[in-house]
């Protein structure tokens, strides 16, 4: 796996990111994301994702919560109603996997 950079995200009152996946044009090689919650002193702004049965999952807002997820999973950030939401997101792209064998 290859780490391809970190992004610092700030969402302020009124901001949101509608339901989407991270496989948009230009990001086809992205396989996973790692998100880390940096603060919890805001309202709204739930990080929501959906499982294969379309069940909604709301991720904890606790500071330090880390979520690793497949880039194909639909997710969103709901509207911020008070304060600012800060997080770091690290996309991870795949490299060609090379089979190795241990020689004894």
What are the functions of these language-model segments?
Residues 1-104:
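Catalytic core of non-heme Fe(II) oxygenases with the double-stranded beta-helix
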């Amino acid at each position: 796996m290859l780490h391809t950079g970190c992004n610092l995200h700030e969402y302020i009152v009124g901001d949101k990111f509608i339901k989407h996946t991270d496989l948009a044009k230009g990001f086809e090689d992205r396989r996973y994301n790692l998100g880390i919650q940096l603060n919890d002193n805001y309202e709204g702004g739930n990080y929501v994702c959906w499982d294969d049965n379309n069940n909604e999952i709301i991720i904890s807002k606790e500071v330090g919560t880390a979520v690793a997820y497949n880039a194909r999973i639909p997710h969103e950030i709901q509207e911020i109603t008070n304060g600012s939401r800060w997080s770091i997101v690290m996309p991870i792209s795949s490299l060609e996997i090379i089979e190795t064998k241990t020689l004894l």
